[in-house]
């Protein structure tokens, strides 16, 4: 274990972890968008900036990419850090005027309005802040790579290749799950899952043989079975709830006999 000082108070930390992980563990509030515990550090949104006041490299840096070392001293509320954070939040408000999650985050850190756009809380505009979590989860975690950054500058966006229906997307919904801005729309309708945001890429859903509920896309099931060895074939046909009930009915009698 090593010792780091955050806002003049000492904390224990594990060698090699990132400062943002320590901040989160210790309940020290700091905003972030591109960080997610399932993904590698990215340092893109810049919101998790802290000031390093003691240690090898003093200055302002992103805590999600700052590896803690023994004796590191950081301040999360230094005046310059707070100033940069507020300007960034104003920019995100302007970039994603339709995202309630971003409005809430900005409000939490003292920003109600943006100087960079006519900010209207009722606006239903763009919700994406280009943090890239969806791109990275699709690539890094699933190994699918159905979406990526497209275009440049003010036209930057995240999309499927050629802005069309994706043949790669498996409809797992991980992208929507990790999106901090609520920018990805998915509609389940009957036996279909429609990835609205990904140009209405449509996937067939599988029906549970026991409950008759539609529970996952056929492509997701194939993907899982292609990665995991020795999964019983019959589990392909049943929802998570039915799987749990099956396991409970297999194991509970043994325990109840004890
Ligand atoms: S739903 Fe499609 S785009 Fe989203 S993470 Fe899964 S495979 Fe990638």
Feature-to-residue mapping (PLM):
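Cys/His-coordinated zinc-binding microdomains
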Residues: 35-38, 49-52, 65-68, 132-142, ...
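Short, structural beta-strand-to-alpha-helix junction motif
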Residues: 17-21, 67
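Extreme N-terminal starter segment of soluble prokaryotic enzymes
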Residues: 1-3
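Short strand-turn-strand beta-turns centered on an Asx-Gly dipeptide
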Residues: 6-9
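Fe-S ferredoxin-like electron-transfer domains
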Residues: 57-168, 185-238
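Immediate flanking context of iron-sulfur cluster ligation sites
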Residues: 22-59, 86-90, 117-126
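Short metal-binding segments enriched for Cys and/or His
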Residues: 238-257
